[in-house]
């Protein structure tokens, strides 16, 4: 219910297609993606500027692929440290688990350290590319209300002036204490950890050793992390009876740092801050014309670095669907698949993060003894040890329902999983990552075949209205065979041989890839038409009003 101010006339009225509450990483990613799709966006943020202190320190391959989708990855990479290993240590300093996955199936290193404020600044600068995106800081969201075809937001500026925003949709990216979620009375189920952790960031890294170390000390567990630009992060468990004020006192801070540094007096402190680790999940992600994303929808402990990355997955999943609905290319039932696809995986990442925290700081002493024993035993079980150290236990996003069409058993199907991103060779000889050849679009990718062959003229018209790219993959040595060219089809060479292996493994020759790079369906040329009809129905696509021209893609 909106708060009414009958005696105060609003200073400004805004009318937009999408209002985003919160200029954190998820809100800024949503704004960048929608901006490049031509959607009119307004971001409103309570603070007067971006948060400038480090928070998240881990960005994964999926999040970098999301940055790539909005043309910002080259600006983000200088603020990352790729291939960032995570090492678990016993109290005596023995490494019992060294997690350093070395695969790059999605085009980027799987584990990377990063400096969040600098990456957030890249995204804020990124929205300036789009005249249809505006960001308003120092705007407190006082109230909002939903009507059949719009959401009305009531804002207050730092000077006390009122503004009204009329939007078709509201995306709440306003954090774990989300005003939007609380106003809608959406349950935020889960637990708050009984213990807290104090985070200490130091400039001119006094250790300068690479990677991140988690020391499972039963007296006081701690974390030591090397970050880009010579920043060192330490995290110490706050013990019962201690307060943030006490730990901030110089003598107590010196005592903490003496645990990890030979000279705790010779440091350049950036900041200290106490955190409570929560594990909570919103019961619903969509409430009519309001959608929850990022921490507003789920929060999790930091131990797997997945809070930030889960928020990026939300933005990538939601943004393309919202754009299609606003453009009239799909009905709003498509937005129901956002919760259907994202909520279960967010829960899996919460559970994994809680488990990792329990490995670092077991709730009971005997659990620590068991952990140490199991870690020793793993040395005699190399396949099991590799399973953990290569992070194969990480729940890869897989959707079992939603905007996809699956034939056969789900367990072995690639449908609902992210498609690989190898390097490909273009016809002009350039070598690039696959997504760069596709852009922010759907793609129908065929191994060796003309992907248009199994489609009717009506289907070609429908999918071209979505800016779908049609890709023919051939062995690299065939890339200049002119007679195989087809109008409206982009030919690429399989530079690394990974696409051939993928299609051979999954017994398919055609894949329909969504804009968020997930496999929506697989087929062979003779079944593609039927599959596309099913997918169009599942996604509630509308029919294009006019013919879409077919042009030759060089």
Curated annotation (Swiss-Prot):
Pathway(s) it belongs to: Aromatic compound metabolism; 3-phenylpropanoate degradation
Q: Which UniProt keywords apply?
A: Aromatic hydrocarbons catabolism, FAD, Flavoprotein, NAD, Oxidoreductase
Q: Which domain of life is it from?
A: Bacteria
Keyword Translocase in record: no
- The enzyme's main class, written as a single word, is oxidoreductase
Catalyzed reactions: 3-(3-hydroxyphenyl)propanoate + NADH + O2 + H(+) = 3-(2,3-dihydroxyphenyl)propanoate + NAD(+) + H2O; (2E)-3-(3-hydroxyphenyl)prop-2-enoate + NADH + O2 + H(+) = (2E)-3-(2,3-dihydroxyphenyl)prop-2-enoate + NAD(+) + H2O
Q: Which Gene3D superfamilies match?
A: 3.30.70.2450, FAD/NAD(P)-binding domain
- Keyword Magnesium assigned: no
What GO biological process terms does the UniProt entry carry, in alphabetical order? Answer: 3-(3-hydroxy)phenylpropionate catabolic process; 3-phenylpropionate catabolic process
Provide the binding site for FAD: 17-46, 285-295
What is a GO molecular function of this protein? 3-(3-hydroxyphenyl)propionate hydroxylase activity
The protein's Enzyme Commission number: 1.14.13.127
The prosthetic group or cofactor this protein requires is: FAD
**PANTHER family, A to Z:** 3-(3-HYDROXY-PHENYL)PROPIONATE/3-HYDROXYCINNAMIC ACID HYDROXYLASE, FAD-BINDING MONOOXYGENASE
Q: Name the protein family.
A: Belongs to the PheA/TfdB FAD monooxygenase family.
NCBIfam families assigned = PRK06183.1-1, PRK06183.1-3, PRK06183.1-5
Q: What does this protein do?
A: Catalyzes the insertion of one atom of molecular oxygen into position 2 of the phenyl ring of 3-(3-hydroxyphenyl)propionate (3-HPP) and hydroxycinnamic acid (3HCI).
State the HAMAP family in the record: MhpA
Its recorded name reads: 3-(3-hydroxy-phenyl)propionate/3-hydroxycinnamic acid hydroxylase
Provide the species name: Escherichia coli O157:H7
